[in-house]
Amino acid sequence: MSNTVRAISPDITLFNKTLTFQEISQNTREAVIYIHGGAWNDPENTPNDFNQLANTIKSMDTESTVCQYSIEYRLSPEITNPRNLYDAVSNITRLVKEKGLTNINMVGHSVGATFIWQILAALKDPQEKMSEAQLQMLGLLQIVKRVFLLDGIYSLKELLVEYPEYDCFTRLAFPDGIQMYEEEPSRVMPYVKKALSRFSIDMHLVHSYSDELLTLRQTNCLISCLQDYQLSFKLYLDDLGLHNDVYKNGKVAKYIFDNIC
């Protein structure tokens, strides 16, 4: 897999695989940036996962008020977390600069939602101690208006309690153990609260009742922590298909469009 990735692009962050579903125009008010999932390691999940959903949003956007992009990142085991997170952050930052984007809406599915959650927790480290990638996360928080977390993974502890067999992919992304995942909700919620408040970011949680790979346990775990800190969020539960149907679902597209326009 790693040889295939390197052959595709000399850019290790794969920026040249960024997809444009809807280009910026003079009427653009909102930018949507998609981050695909795939358990950190599945090459079958790509930026093109969101093609159908993005085209549905484009068909609704009769006044061309939205632009839409989807970014790529390297996979495990070639690299481990947080390096793949940093790939995503680097590519989003570059896209924002090249296109002059403001009013960002980040949409992540599965591990893509995990990445967004990790970005929201960026304030866990003092700014003077932040790495370049962490400073980029801080910069993104300043222009992100909404996040849409679709059937996401938020707590690796809860994930492996419910699905011990998922260790087959978590150990690829976290070879030194899931304790290296620093964004367990119960641990970072004070910093997420600070970010949501300071930067006025709206959080949307979406989950399909028919998801065969993730039950509601992940979403409910996150909701419990959000409620403990009395944080505002919106929840959309529906039959949105199987896990890999969610990012194609027309009802999800309408939910996103209705909440950004």
From Swiss-Prot:
GO terms for molecular function: arylformamidase activity. A motif (HGGXW) lies at residues 36-40. It catalyses: N-formyl-L-kynurenine + H2O = L-kynurenine + formate + H(+). InterPro entries: AB_hydrolase_3, AB_hydrolase_fold, KFase_ver/fungi-typ. The modification Phosphoserine is found at S9. GO terms for biological process: 'de novo' NAD biosynthetic process from L-tryptophan; L-tryptophan catabolic process to kynurenine; NAD biosynthetic process; positive regulation of cell growth. Keywords: Hydrolase, Phosphoprotein, Tryptophan catabolism. Disruption phenotype: Cells exhibit slow growth in the absence of nicotinate. Belongs to the kynurenine formamidase family. Catalyzes the hydrolysis of N-formyl-L-kynurenine to L-kynurenine, the second step in the kynurenine pathway of tryptophan degradation. Kynurenine may be further oxidized to nicotinic acid, NAD(H) and NADP(H). Required for elimination of toxic metabolites. This is Kynurenine formamidase. The lineage of its organism: Eukaryota, Fungi, Dikarya, Ascomycota, Saccharomycotina. The gene is BNA7.
